[in-house]
């Protein structure tokens, strides 16, 4: 709705320019003035026209203003020096906004484009650790936003079953009779076996040749028992990883195995397409100097086996055939590999993926011990967050039963992790701070609390969600701010989807909760002479907060 207001202003300015016989092809920039007394939207187009028209910006602004036909939802237009300021008619606009918002608010029309979004894709040799967390959360949140924006999105986890790590586990289980501990979560049990195997390799480096032999045999695909062993290890570990993803409210559409592309001939197919550009010496490689990439892309080892990059090319060829847009979520340390991959794909008449790169998460010293280099698993991290959330809920002495505290602790604990990561632009590194993540003033809990407040207020009232209301009074600043913020939801979804950036929506959601809390604290709702309209405003806030959190993969408790 807010974007519609912008469109109407743009059209009214263009009409005024036409009347004045002024040609202007550039984009008309609209901004929100720093002070509400200066209007709701403002443009400095007069500055841009000054040199062309050889007039002062103040004079130009006045001429444009005098020729503007005021759009429907605006009450006046004024000039302040060279700026043209527009003032929303909040009586009309509020009636429109509160009656428009329903449970589907923010959904955009269906688009034809199919997006194949790959994220997480951690090696199945142990549990997800904090290093994987940002990838998983950004990927899942982006999937939700893109779907809400009308795209058909499939989220895939690329299962690296052909990696050396899996061969090491299979080797150790066979050579030393290592077994998984059935009492432990599957991925953690596999991780322990992997650790034991690596200890053996460190003590006996000559064993590495045996690993090479196992990898070669698995790639040949003729040893059925070996294939079963690899698949058994990977499936067992992935089962544990799926549990962790579920705890984070993440659901994949498909787990696509790396070996699929070797077995079905896709690897040979992509190598054949690249043959005119490759060089065969001891190894097969693709030189990339002519594309300003110093490091060549190795495609086949001297023993004839393929590499991860080769199979990844085949996977991305599959993406090209099965989607209109390929979208990868990758750590910033993958920039060179992504560049090499993209060039190789284009040379083989395939499509290079769009890539969202992200920086990494640091844990502040002392918050969670890394136990001398041992990684922090996502399971441990979630457990810590839920425990912190529980302590905070108890400290606040909220009106909750013991069962409700347990339930809300899990919702707030997981939500706080997701929101803290989502609110920061992926280009920026994160230092995770519990006191900020779990803050009831500026963290996810503050948003969830605002939602619970709205639910409680509506439950105490005689609110009828199906009754349309009219605004028939002059709104205060808190109400105007809330109405304006509510109206911006769809525009923010568009921005997040187009830019592939989740933090726009996260930051908007926090702003909305702050606007609602200001309104809640300053205005009587039940029993006021404007009760029906204000209840409608409360419900519109509840819906928009809930929808916003859902797109960020966060649950909205109805009580806190």
Curated annotation (Swiss-Prot):
Reaction catalysed by this enzyme? tRNA(Arg) + L-arginine + ATP = L-arginyl-tRNA(Arg) + AMP + diphosphate
- Keyword Ion transport set for record: no
Q: Which InterPro entries match?
A: aa-tRNA-synth_I_CS, Arg-tRNA-ligase, Arg-tRNA-synth_N, Arg-tRNA-synth_N_sf, ArgRS_core, DALR_anticod-bd, Rossmann-like_a/b/a_fold, tRNAsynth_Ia_anticodon-bd
Question: What EC number(s) does the entry state?
Answer: 6.1.1.19
Looking up SMART domains in the UniProt record yields: Arg_tRNA_synt_N, DALR_1
Q: Which key words tag this protein in UniProt?
A: Aminoacyl-tRNA synthetase, ATP-binding, Cytoplasm, Ligase, Nucleotide-binding, Protein biosynthesis
Q: GO molecular function of the protein, one example? A: ATP binding
Q: Which GO terms describe its cellular component?
A: cytoplasm
Intervals of motif 'HIGH' region: 122-132
Q: What class of enzyme is it?
A: ligase
Q: Which domain of life is it from?
A: Archaea
The biological processes this protein is annotated with in GO are: arginyl-tRNA aminoacylation
> Where in the cell is the protein located?
Cytoplasm
Q: Which HAMAP family match?
A: Arg_tRNA_synth
The family this protein is said to belong to: Belongs to the class-I aminoacyl-tRNA synthetase family.
| Identification of the protein by name | Arginine--tRNA ligase
Species for this entry: Methanosphaera stadtmanae (strain ATCC 43021 / DSM 3091 / JCM 11832 / MCB-3)
Q: What is the lineage of its organism?
A: Archaea, Methanobacteriati, Methanobacteriota, Methanomada group, Methanobacteria
